[in-house]
Structures are given as C-alpha cells and as structure tokens.
C-alpha cells in the first residue's frame, strides 16, 4: 500500500472520463487500498481513481459508517433533492453549495467481482454522486449553485457539516 498524490484542479486527468474495470486483479485491489489510505490520510470522505491519476472506474467512500469500495459504480435510481456544502481534495479551500438527489441507488462490483447495490441517503447519496461525477470528468464546481465565502466556510466547519473533505 502507498499514499498517492492527489491531483489538483488544472490537472487534465480530472476532466477525463474513467474507463471501466474489465478485470479485478491484484493491481486493481492495490489501487483500491492505496486510494483508501490516501483518502484517510487526507481526512477525506471519498476519493475517485481520477484523483490519483488512474483513469479507471474506482471509488472509495467512508462517511463514518465504514469503508466502501466500488468498482464500476453506476447510479441506477435517484429521488428527491438536497442542497448542501461540498469541497474536494482536488480543489483545496473551495466550498460550494451543490444540488444533489436526496437518495440514490448505485450498482457496482465489489472486490470479488460480485454485483452489488447500495442505497444512500443524505451525506452518502451526496458522496456517491460527487465521486461518480469525478469518474465522468465532472467536478463539484461545475454544479455549484454558489461558493461560500470564508466566514460561511467557518460556520459550516463549526456545525460539523464539512469536518472532512471529499
């Protein structure tokens, strides 16, 4: 396992669409492990493979309920609406309000290659959408309704809504 460099805004890899994983092998599993370690070291909520320069459809997420590893994730259902603050490990210091579905269902493969589904609401739904957007070359700043100023960012941190980055 290794800590990977998190690519920052301006790096063209963040704007590229990731390719599906066709074979789950030791290389893919190592990337997932590196992604999780990198996410935790950076105090993140999620990380997409694009963010470490790997153009494969891989995502790791932990909203405080344990690590999720998703291979080839795809949103198959969404409902409702929520607006909330988002940041990104690839765009340090920027926080914006983004409209997302309140609830999503995502189909994906686990590390054994079994097809799974996960339903997420609130923060998990937001994180799933945010990371899957990354896989499609879309950043939260593309969808932000508005950006928070420094005082607002401090208030959001104080109330615990942004205690961890994306």
From Swiss-Prot:
Q: Where is the active site?
A: 131
* Record InterPro entries: Peptide_deformylase, Peptide_deformylase_sf
Give the protein name, as stated in the record.
Peptide deformylase
Cofactor(s) the record lists? Fe(2+)
Residue ranges crossing the lipid bilayer per the database entry: none
In its UniProt entry, the species of origin is given as: Thermoanaerobacter sp. (strain X514)
Q: Which reaction does it catalyse?
A: N-terminal N-formyl-L-methionyl-[peptide] + H2O = N-terminal L-methionyl-[peptide] + formate
Which GO terms of the molecular function aspect are on file? metal ion binding; peptide deformylase activity
Tell me which EC number(s) this protein carries: 3.5.1.88
Does the keyword field hold Metal-binding? yes
Entry cofactor note text?
Answer: Binds 1 Fe(2+) ion.
EC class, as a word, reads: hydrolase
One BP annotation, GO: translation
Annotated residues that bind Fe cation are located at 88, 130, 134
Gene symbol here is def
General function of this protein:
Removes the formyl group from the N-terminal Met of newly synthesized proteins. Requires at least a dipeptide for an efficient rate of reaction. N-terminal L-methionine is a prerequisite for activity but the enzyme has broad specificity at other positions.
The highest taxon in the source lineage is Bacteria
Q: Which family does it belong to?
A: Belongs to the polypeptide deformylase family.
Q: Does the keyword NADP apply?
A: no
Arranged from A to Z, the UniProt key words for this protein are: Hydrolase, Iron, Metal-binding, Protein biosynthesis
């Amino acid at each position: 396992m290794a800590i990977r460099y998190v690519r920052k805004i301006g790096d063209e890899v963040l704007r590229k669409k990731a390719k599906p994983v066709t074979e789950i092998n030791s290389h893919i599993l190592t990337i997932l492990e590196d992604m999780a370690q990198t996410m935790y070291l950076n105090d993140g909520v999620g990380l997409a493979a694009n963010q470490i320069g790997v153009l494969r459809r891989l995502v790791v997420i932990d909203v405080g309920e344990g690590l999720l590893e998703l291979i080839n994730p795809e949103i198959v259902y969404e409902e409702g609406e929520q607006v909330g603050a988002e940041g990104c490990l690839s765009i340090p210091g920027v926080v914006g309000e983004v409209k997302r579905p309140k609830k999503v269902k995502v189909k994906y493969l686990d590390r054994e290659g079994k097809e799974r589904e996960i339903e997420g609401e609130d923060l998990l739904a937001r994180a799933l959408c945010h990371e899957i957007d990354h896989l499609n070359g879309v950043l939260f700043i593309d969808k932000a309704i508005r950006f928070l100023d420094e005082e607002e960012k401090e208030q959001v941190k104080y109330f615990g809504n942004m205690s961890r980055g994306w």
